[in-house]
Regions:
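Structural marker of alpha-solenoid helical repeat scaffolds
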Residues: 3, 37, 71, 88, ...
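Structural signature of tandem alpha-helical TPR/SEL1-like repeats
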Residues: 21-29, 33, 55-67, 89-101
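Alpha-helical segment of the N-proximal tetratricopeptide repeat
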Residues: 6-40, 54
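Terminal, low-structured helical/coil segments at or just beyond the last alpha-helical repeat
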Residues: 4, 8, 96-125
C-alpha cells in the first residue's frame, strides 16, 4: 500500500502519542518515514529531536534541534530544548547561551529560571 500524505499525518500523530506514552524509540521509527517523505517538515523534526532526547540519544537530538533552529532561529522552545541537550551532555557554556536565547525570545518563567541571568555563563550558579 503506497504511503499518502494522510499516512504521514497519522504517523506524526501516533508518534506524538508514543512520545507522551514514554516510547521515544517507537516515535523515532514512525517519524523517520515522515521526515524521509517531507524533509522540510520542521514540526516532525522538532518532535523527532524531542524523541531522541527522551531516548538519551543526545547527538541525534542536538543535530535535529540545530536543524530546526537553522530554519526557525526565533523558535524559543527549540533553543530551550537544545540547551537542555547541551546541559545533559555536560556542555554548560553552550547550554547557557541557548537558555538565554530562549528566555530572550519568550520570557516564560521556566526559560528565565534556566537562563540564570544573574550568574556568569556556564558557572552553574
Amino acid at each position: 500500500m503506497p504511503e499518502s500524505p494522510e499516512t504521514h499525518v497519522i504517523d506524526f500523530r501516533a508518534a506524538e502519542q508514543l512520545l507522551a506514552a514514554r516510547d521515544p524509540r517507537g516515535a523515532v521509527k514512525l517519524l523517520d518515514s515522515v521526515i524521509a517523505a517531507h524533509p522540510e517538515n520542521t514540526a516532525a523534526r522538532l518532535l523527532r529531536a524531542r524523541a531522541f532526547f527522551a531516548a538519551a540519544q543526545l547527538r541525534p537530538a542536538e543535530l535535529e534541534f540545530e536543524l530546526v533552529l537553522e530554519r526557525e532561529p526565533d523558535n524559543a522552545f527549540a533553543h530551550f530544548a537544545l540547551a537542555r541537550t547541551y546541559e545533559r551532555a555536560g556542555r554548560p557554556e553552550q547550554a547557557t547561551k541557548h537558555f538565554r536565547l530562549a528566555a530572550a525570545l519568550d520570557p516564560k518563567p521556566e526559560y528565565i529560571k534556566a537562563a540564570r541571568f544573574d550568574s556568569a555563563p556556564g558557572s552553574g550558579d
